[in-house]
Design a protein with these regions (language model features):
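Noncatalytic alpha-helical scaffold of FAD-dependent oxidoreductases
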Residues: 1-175
Length: 175
């Protein structure tokens, strides 16, 4: 609904209206308490990057979400250019899909997201670690094939493993 309203709000022929950077890139900031739209239990964010030629797989992911009754208030689909040289860099040439997934009222949500994660790996994509809260650690090396390079940097910067996080423990990044 939000996506449709946002699309229809744009004037068809208006060319002389300037928006601030914040208005353009953060439209939800204009919606009072937008984060409460999913209720007390809230939502989780799931974001993947897929290679440019994986449009059929992108459609498959969207269809699985729709078939499961996953009605997301906000979805973002963007085309990525080339990624950068960081060993855990998320962007890659292709597509990124981000969705807000309600955490209640969807039976089988964990299994659905696990299957989506597996499909992402099958086509050479990855999940966005900054938004991930549930990915299986076994998938990480396939999504981030330069993980060993990152571990070398980690070992040099923190040989005593003093720096860690819940995510690092869950994904077995701490080593």
């Amino acid at each position: 609904v939000f996506n449709e309203a946002w699309y229809r709000k744009a004037p068809v022929r208006q060319r002389d209206h300037l928006q601030t950077i914040s208005q353009f890139f953060h439209p939800l900031d204009m919606v009072h308490h937008w984060n409460r739209v999913y209720g007390r239990s809230g939502f989780l964010q799931w974001q993947c990057a897929l290679p440019l030629d994986a449009t059929d797989d992108l459609r498959w992911i969207i269809t699985r979400l729709s078939d499961a009754g996953c009605s997301s208030f906000l979805n973002v689909l963007k085309r990525f250019g080339p990624g950068n040289d960081g060993p855990l860099s998320f962007p890659m040439a292709g597509w990124t899909l981000a969705i807000d997934v309600p955490t209640v009222g969807m039976a089988g949500l964990a299994a659905l997201l696990d299957r989506l994660d597996e499909r992402v790996v099958e086509v050479g994509g990855r999940l966005y670690l900054a938004k991930d809260s549930r990915m299986a650690p076994e998938l990480l090396p396939a999504m981030y094939p330069r993980l060993d390079e990152w571990r070398k940097v980690r070992d040099a910067a923190d040989p005593d493993r003093l720096l860690t996080s819940d995510q690092a423990r869950r994904l077995r990044l701490h080593g």
